[in-house]
Amino acid sequence: MRKWIILLLLPVVSFVKNKEQQSWIRINQLGYTPDGVKVAVWCSKVQSGISSWQLVDVAAKKVMFTGKVGNAFGAYGPFKQTFRLNFSSFKKPGRYYLQVGGAKSPEFEIGNDVYKGAADFCLRYMRQQRSGFNPYLKDSCHTHDGYVLYGEKAGIKDSTQIDVVGGWHDASDYLQYSATSANATYHLLMAYRDFPKVFTDEKKANGLDGKNGIADVKDEAKWGLNWLLKMHPKDNWMFNQLGDDRDHMGMRIPKEDSFYGKGFERPVYFVSGALQQRGKFMNNTTGTSSTAAKFASAFALGKELFKKDKEFSELLDQKATTALQYAYIKKGVSQTASVRSPYIYAEDNWVDDLELAETAVGNLFKSAAINDPASRSSTAELYQNAFEFAKQEPITPWIGADTAKHYQWYPFINLGHYELARQLKDKRRDTVIGYYKQGIQKVWKKAQTNAFYRGVPFIWCSNNLTTSFAIQCYWYKTLTGDKTFSELEQANFDWLFGCNPWGTSMVYGLPSWGDTPVDPHSAFTHLKNYPIDGGLVDGPVYGSIYKGLIGIQLKDADEYAEFQSDVAVYHDDYGDYSSNEPTMDGTASLIYLLAAKEAESKGGFSYSHGGIIRGDSTQKKIALVFTGHEFAEGGNFIANTLQQQKINASFFFTGDFYYDAKKEKLINQLAKAGHFLGNHSQDHLLYCDWNKRDSLLVGKQPFLNDLLGLSERLGHISDELNDPPSLSKSSYYFLPPYEWYNDSIAAWCKEYGKQLINYTPGTLSHADYTTIKDKNYRSSEIIYQSIINYEQNNPAGLNGFLLLMHIGSGPDRTDKFYNRLPGLIKYLKAKGYQFQTVAGLLSLN
């Protein structure tokens, strides 16, 4: 009987096997933006082809788009055939999935907000990694750190106690490294500098719930800076790491460690520039530069971003200088130390660190040069030093290579190239940007041969490399406007969130609905089932690396077994520390990348006190705005310039201006030419106190009289000129007198159907009325350079700018800025900007 049962079951078993899934569609589980690159990857275990595929609306269950496949990419890893499915031309927001035959992708969203909050989400992991007071545990740990080793050259006896409590634990172990901490701090500072609107304020400085008026990312960066200050307490004292691999003797929730033979103290290793222990051997330390230069860079950028905290800012300024000096004690690398095993951060490059440090410190001198011309020569010298270092390592050595040692080339990309290119104005800028392009081309040469566009090597922490390379592509695009590598950039980003052979996100808990790590190599999850939200895991490694590592043993069955190959191995398993351990510095880099992605996709307006102060910062469009009250001597010149350049601008005048018979001809000329004429108030009143902005100087009714008093006059002008399009929204937008208002004024505008706007801050264009007798006087050259500098030094340039100037400045100012208008317009045109009226710019939303 048993034989018959077996025989009867055989066809069923055979049928089930034939129906096992043979093909998959990999997507970015976070989703895609309407105007962004959108590519999925179809991959199959059988050698077969496909000709077309469909994009299906989840709610309507309707095929919305049918695409034809391009060239087959062939075998990759565990797959015998792969194709790229490009649906970038489909832009309608919604929830969709892709299907090809029997293969169906996970559902995903297309929308402008798909990346919203992702950067802030990853900050959760950074807070959870805090040493000292840990806000996640609501408890303190490692409060006895530490005792000094290798400090004899600086006159520090071995085992001398020093306070270095704080900072971040490096990964799932609790070691702390100056190099990774300084790099993480710099990335967080950059993220806030470049994308301040992305981040929210939901936590206090200690990481607990509550607002403190400071963006959470800035709080986190300051946590890093405070620890770095402890690690460089004196001009001739600097420390490289806290703890060593004796930490690996047991997994535990961070509290106090007694592994080191001195109670609960942990060793803190001095930056000596000399060889230090590496297990049974010695490391290859050659100098002080790599670590000290990272300190200098973080301190310098921190100084710029914490100017309002004068005492802290001045301390960072001082430490940036001493850290840079420390970097030159002995040129070379400072590798980390270990006691029990040979695993260390064996960094081999340092010129990239000095390039960034010289640039960052140069920026401090540049800021000082505004009031101290003597600093200009120092700035130029520092930038030239940085350029010389850039030439020594034009391309980060792992880029284009098949392998590298663990953290051999660190940071994983050259941040100095980006920061230096933002400052240079001559041919050196093109040279430095060219280095980025050469590196990207090296990766592209490998990536274009496979459907995942994978050109990053599968070495330890490959996800960190992937994140950094995507940032390099983004920076190249930002610096040049060249989108040649946008699809490669997006492919690396997509890889991190599911468009990879395993179909999984590499970030714990992101997205919340997706396939993400659940069993990382972490004590928090393994011992207590605590989530480690936002942590970026190390990522896949070559099969050969995985097989050669010490102490790896999976604790559960491998759910990704059918997707493993010699090309790459990844496990969501606590036992695999090579591919599934999150790292603090990798997560900090990802925070920058996610912030960039969110900023790119926002496409919204910027507001201040209820007023719009900037249009869409992702669009290369700008509005020239001229205000007028008493003077108008520049009117004819401005009008003629705009006519010659064939562009339109916006003019906001007061009642005194509009009712002045002497100005009637100019007003009509501007309106007939298609320029926007707007409301700058009836009587040019000051609405609120200069020093106490919340204090109103007018009541609601006097304000409304000032706001609405011009409606009749603007209506008459419109009637007289047969309602030209330029006046169709003239009474809707209101630019307040003195460009000064508060939330109450903006709310009253909204109540009466008006939208308050103001100029975009960042340049000195609005200072073109000042006279040489004024304390705040700015010459036309200084004003012009402030505009050019802002355009060149900020990732979004002047995108969406409301660039405000005055139609006249009166007889006391002889240096008329409007005379620079032709040159300014030509410059902006050459940069690719499109000129729009205020109505045109702000109707884009």
Where are the predicted features?
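Aromatic (Trp/Tyr) and acidic
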Residues: 29-101, 106, 112, 127-183, ...
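Carboxylate/His-rich catalytic cores and anion/metal-binding grooves
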Residues: 217-237
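N-terminal carbohydrate-binding/catalytic regions of secreted carbohydrate-active enzymes
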Residues: 37-68, 72-77, 332-350, 611-667
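Acidic, glycine-anchored loop motifs typical of Ca2+
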Residues: 206-214
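Structural recognition of the beta-strand scaffold that forms the well-ordered cores
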Residues: 185-192, 228-230, 239, 355-356, ...
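Catalytic domains of cell-wall/extracellular-matrix polysaccharide-remodeling enzymes
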Residues: 637, 659-662, 684-804, 808-834, ...
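Active-site beta->alpha N-cap acidic-glycine motif
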Residues: 604-694, 709, 713-732, 827, ...
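Bacterial Sec-dependent N-terminal signal peptides
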Residues: 1-21
